[in-house]
Amino acid sequence: MPYSHNVELPPAVRSHLPEHAQDIYREAFNHAFAAHTADPRQEEAAHRIAWGAVKRRYVKEGDFWVERSS
C-alpha cells in the first residue's frame, strides 16, 4: 500500500525520523512497492528497502536520526 503523504507512514517511522528522512522513506517505499509486485512479501521488501534508503543519508545518534556528514 503506497503512501501519498508522510502522515500515512507507520507510527514508528513518523515518530522517529525527521521530516526529510520521512520523505526519503516514503519515496523509496513507494518505488520498491511498485517494483516488487510479483513478490509475495512485497510490503516487507518495500519497508526493508525504504529503511536502507534512509540509512544511506541518516545515522542514528542516541535517540535521534541525523543527516550524515558529506
Describe every region a protein language model picked out.
Residues 1-70:
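C-terminal alpha-helical interaction appendages
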